[in-house]
Amino acid sequence: MRKRFVPIALGILLVLGNCHAGNSPKTVSNMNSSVKVVELTNEVFKQKVFNYEINKTWKFEGNLPVIIDFYATWCGPCRQLSPLVEEMAKKYDGKIVVYKVDTDKEQLLAQSMGIQNLPTLLFIPAKGQPRSTMGAIPRETLEKAIAEVLMVK
């Protein structure tokens, strides 16, 4: 799999309209782990990641680096990647935050972030611009992105 990071087009965020979604994040958890991957909605995205209604340029709302897994339940490569994403959430607990976005339920959010291929992982460093990778990437590539993009060891 090619190791390709694509800068996120923030201009897409500027054309978003209001979207009403539930404010309660759902969690997805591996049964053997107490670390939870939070199911991200558009409203929670604006609170925890980027509030495009207030900010016209990228302004990360969080304190810790973030990985967002854009997926669909029917997507085979997404199902392959999911356990690895959960494993990274556990391994880097307290160092990064890991979210998941079901693109079928959160179409506006996926569209606003320019998501066209599944799975897509969005890496958001605490400072700097987000980057993404597409496809079911191997563990080594994911760990390299965490180290190089999120600057977490």
Task: Describe these PLM feature segments.
Residues 63-66, 94-96, 126:
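Loop/turn elements at helix/coil->beta-strand transitions in domains of secreted/extracellular proteins
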Residues 40-64:
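A short beta-strand-turn-helix
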Residues 70, 81-89, 93-108, 115:
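Thiol-based oxidoreductase modules, predominantly thioredoxin-like and allied folds used
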Residues 38, 97-99, 130-133:
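Structural signal for short hydrophobic segments within the conserved structured cores
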Residues 63-66, 70-74, 117:
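Short pre-active-site segment immediately N-terminal to redox-active cysteine/selenocysteine motifs
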Residues 1-43, 153:
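N-terminal targeting signals for export/organelle localization
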Residues 73-80, 120:
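C-type cytochrome heme c attachment motif
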Residues 117, 122-153:
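Non-catalytic, surface beta->alpha helical segment in thiol-disulfide oxidoreductase systems
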